[in-house]
Amino acid sequence: MARVRTYHNYNEAWGEWRRLGIPDRAFTRFDLASRQFIFIDSVSKEEVSALQEELAPKKVTVLPCRGDRALVAITPLTLESVLMTGASPRVMEMGEALRFRNDVEPPAFEWSGGSLDLSRPRVMGILNVTPDSFSDGGRHLDADAAMQSALAMKDEGVDIIDIGGESTRPGSSPVTPDQEWSRISDVVKRVSEEVGLPISVDTRRPEVAKKALRAGAVMVNDVSGLKDGMIEVVREEGAAAFVMHMRGEPSNMQDDTRYTDVVGDVYAFLEKRVREAVSAGIPRERLGIDPGLGFAKDVDGNLEIMSRLDELRSMGRPVLLGASRKAFLGKIAGGGPEDRLDASLAAAAVACWQGVHLFRVHDVKETVRTLKAASAMRSGISPR
C-alpha cells in the first residue's frame, strides 16, 4: 500500500521525518525539490530490506519509519525505468499510487444502473431528518419541509442529496434502527420520486441502509467504515458506498485523537476497508473514501488532513470531504455553526485545489459557486 507525499517546505518535511524516526538530515533541500517521496504502509522489516536491495542499483533511498512504514525517495523517471524493466509488487504499488495521485483521469464512481462523472467537483447536499444534528437539527422533521429543502438544493446545483436520520456529532446518543428509519422513510421515497437526483443514505446500520436502497437511494454514506454487515448490504443491493474513517462511536470518539501520523493512519484504515469490501464482492468503482474530519480528530489533526488531502488520491478512489460548518472551523475562525459559511467555503476551495472530488455541505449555492471558481483557477480553463 503506497501513498504519495508532497511537502510544502523543508521544515515541514524535516519535522515529519524526525517524528517518524528518520535520521536527521537524511535528505537535503535539493532532494526535496528533485525527488518524489512515497510512503509504503503496513510493510515488514523483511520487505524493507528487499526493497532496499531491489532499488539500490538505481541509487534509490529506502528508509524504515516508525509505524510499519517505509519512505522511498525516487525520481519519477527512475520509477518509470524500474517499472519498465520489471518490478516487485511493492514497487508496482508505488507506480500505481503516483499515477492515481497525478490524476491521469478521474476515478470512476458507479452504482447499479448509474454513475457520476467526476471530471469536475460534485456537491452532496445535507438533508438531516433529525432533532439534534449540530447545524440543522429539527428543520426537516416534517416530510414536506424536507422536500422543500431538497428541491431548493436541486435548484442551487446540488449533485447528490444525502439523507440521514441519526446525528453522529461528537457526544451524540444513538437511536434505534426503527427510530432512524421512521424519520427518513417518507423523505427517501418522496425525494427519490420527485427530485430526480441520486440519493445517498447517511447511516451506519445495515438494516436501515437496505430499506433506504430499496426505497430509492443508490449509495450509502457510512461513518463507521462499512462494518457489521454493511458490506453485504451494499454488495447485494448493487449500491455505491463512501467509507469514512472513525475510531470508536460518536459518543466517545473524541476520547482518543492521538495518531503517529494522522494522514498515514487514516489512509491505512481506508485502504484496508476498501480492500476488504472489494474482496467481499463490491466492485472497486463503487467505493469512495472520506477522511472523517471531526471524527476522532482534534483541531490540529483536522488541519493536518486539510493540508494533505492530495495524498488520499493515491488510492485511486473518489475522495469525499465533509468540512461544512464543523467545530474545528469555529475554533480557528470563530463563530457557531450558523456563522461558519466563510470558513466552510475556504475549506472547499483548499480541498478543490488538492483534487478532492466530492463535497458534503449545508450551503449548496455558495459551495457550487466557490468550487466553480476554484476549479477554473486550478485547471486554468474557464467553465463551459
Can you annotate each of these PLM segments?
Residues 68-114:
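Non-catalytic propeptide/linker segments at domain boundaries
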Residues 1-57, 68-70, 111, 118, ...:
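Active-site-adjacent loop and "lid" segments of alpha/beta metabolic enzymes
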Residues 154-155, 273-286:
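Phosphate/pyrophosphate-binding loops at sites that engage ATP/ADP/AMP, CoA/4′-phosphopantetheine
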Residues 148-164:
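Catalytic domains of carbohydrate-active enzymes, especially glycoside hydrolases
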